Amino acid sequence: MKTRKGIILAGGSGTRLYPVTMAVSKQLLPIYDKPMIYYPLSTLMLAGIRDILIISTPQDTPRFQQLLGDGSQWGLNLQYKVQPSPDGLAQAFIIGEDFIGGDDCALVLGDNIFYGHDLPKLMEAAVNKESGATVFAYHVNDPERYGVVEFDNNGTAISLEEKPLEPKSNYAVTGLYFYDNDVVEMARKNLKPSARGELEITDINRIYMEQGRLSVAMMGRGYAWLDTGTHQSLIEASNFIATIEERQGLKVSCPEEIAYRKGFIDAEQVKVLAEPLKKNAYGQYLLKMIKGY
C-alpha cells in the first residue's frame, strides 16, 4: 500500500477575525483548551498519517515551528513550507510537490474542526482507496457559504459549485480531502486562477468527478464540522469542545493521547510531555490516561 502524506493549510490573513488576528495566525488562536491547529493535526493523526507538511505565511511559519517543532515528540514528522500569498487552496499541492513526492496525500484546512465517534472509520476507507479522490459532505443550513455538491438519485455526485448564489443542495464539501498522486500534476497543469484569482480546490474535485474518480463520503447526524472563520464561530467551537470535555471527562483532539493510543509514542514519552503541564488540567489528564483511568 502506498504511503499517504498529510498537508495542513494554515495560511491566509484572517481578515474576517480582525483585530484578533492582526498580530497572530487564526490557527494559533485557542479553541477552548488547545491551539486551533491541534484539531486538524489530530484529524490527520486519527487517519494514521504521520508525515505532515504545514503551510503558512512567512510571518506565522516560525510560530508554528515554535509550537509544534518537528513533531517527534508525538511520533510524527512535521515539515514546513511558506505560502507567500493566499492564492487558493489548490496551491497547497504545488507548494507541497517535493514533500508529496510519489505518494498519495490528504489536505485539511487549518481552521476546520471535525468531531464524531466514527470519524477514524470514515477516513479509513479514504486512506485505503487505491486511486481517485474522496471528499466529505456535510448538511448545512447556509450552503451558499461553501463549495456545494449535488447528488443524483443513486447518491452519485453530479455537480460541484463554489459558493453558489442558488445552491442545488444543502450539502457542503468540508475542508478535508484525500487524493491520489495525480493531484499534483492536476494542480500544476490543469488549473487556471478563478475569477477571484485563486487556484480553487473545487476545480480539482470537479476534474476527479468528471473522470468518475470522486467519492463523496457523507458526514451524517452525529458528526460535527465546525468552520472557525468568524468571531461567533470561534466562541461556538470553544463552547462545543468545552461541553463535550466537561461532560465526558475525555479530551477532543489531544495529540498526545492520539499518539499514545495509536502506538506512535509510549507511556514514558507521555509522562515527559505531561511534566511541564502538570499544574493544569491538561497535564493531569495525560498523567491519568497512562495510569488507565
Swiss-Prot record:
Name of the protein described by the UniProt record: Glucose-1-phosphate thymidylyltransferase
Gene Ontology annotations of biological process type: dTDP-rhamnose biosynthetic process; O antigen biosynthetic process; polysaccharide biosynthetic process
CDD domains, sorted: G1P_TT_short
Pathway where this protein functions: Carbohydrate biosynthesis; dTDP-L-rhamnose biosynthesis; Bacterial outer membrane biogenesis; LPS O-antigen biosynthesis
Residues the record lists as binding Mg(2+): D111, D227
Source organism (scientific name): Escherichia coli
Residues annotated as transmembrane: none
NCBIfam families in the record: PRK15480.1 (NF012024), rmlA (TIGR01207)
Cofactor(s) for this UniProt protein: Mg(2+)
Record keyword Protein biosynthesis present: no
Record's catalysed reaction(s): dTTP + alpha-D-glucose 1-phosphate + H(+) = dTDP-alpha-D-glucose + diphosphate
